[in-house]
């Protein structure tokens, strides 16, 4: 899949014919995952990435420096606000643990001093074993967890089955590994999904999602 640089209105910054493909084809199989790769799911890392992206874009397209700086400041300010606002909110809660299908939220958990309990590994390709599900049920009941998080944009079948077992409910968390048709329709970007993730986690813990 080729990628092209666009401005905030969706217009190409350079003529398409002059653009170079950043990556052709799928990126799957290029790396062997031995660590949590979901580092973008962090308000702290996100700010670093926006700064790094701005610097590289200015280096390549200095004529657009003002636009890049403006957009970077907007994004960094939003993440800073989310960080400060929700760190205060999470500090006031006794609950810290949440149950999730996909093991993708270690960085977000770190940012807000939370603990994730995943059913799957670092990829969402494999299904959890019956033994894993039984342990998750016992874990949830022991800690009075009533929310099971599924990956936003994918069927919540496994999360719903577990939620029914513990008499709970399901809620979405976005790993942002892919873009869904619904996200395109709603024009949901990185900041929107980060805010949704943090808000959903907070609401579940505030109302009884762990201890």
Can you say where each PLM-predicted feature lies in the sequence?
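Extracytoplasmic metal-acquisition and chelation regions
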Residues: 1-211
């Amino acid at each position: 899949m080729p990628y092209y640089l666009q401005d905030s209105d969706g217009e190409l910054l350079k003529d398409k014919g002059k653009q170079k493909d950043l990556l052709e084809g799928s990126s799957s199989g290029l790396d062997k995952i031995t660590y949590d790769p979901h580092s973008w799911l962090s308000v702290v890392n996100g700010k670093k990435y926006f700064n790094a992206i701005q610097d590289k874009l200015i280096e390549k397209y200095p004529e657009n420096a003002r636009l890049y700086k403006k957009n970077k400041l907007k994004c960094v300010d939003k993440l800073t606000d989310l960080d400060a606002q929700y760190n205060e909110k999470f500090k006031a809660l006794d609950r810290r643990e949440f149950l999730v299908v996909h093991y993708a939220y270690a960085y977000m958990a770190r940012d807000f001093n939370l603990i994730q309990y995943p059913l799957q590994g670092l990829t969402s390709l494999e299904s959890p074993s019956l033994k894993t599900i039984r342990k998750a049920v016992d874990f949830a009941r022991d800690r009075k967890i009533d929310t099971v998080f599924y990956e936003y944009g994918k069927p919540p079948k496994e999360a719903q089955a577990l939620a029914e077992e513990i008499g709970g409910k399901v809620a979405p968390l976005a790993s942002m590994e892919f873009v869904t048709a619904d996200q395109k329709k709603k024009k949901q970007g990185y900041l929107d999904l980060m805010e949704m993730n943090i808000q959903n986690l907070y609401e579940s813990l505030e109302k009884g999602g762990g201890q």
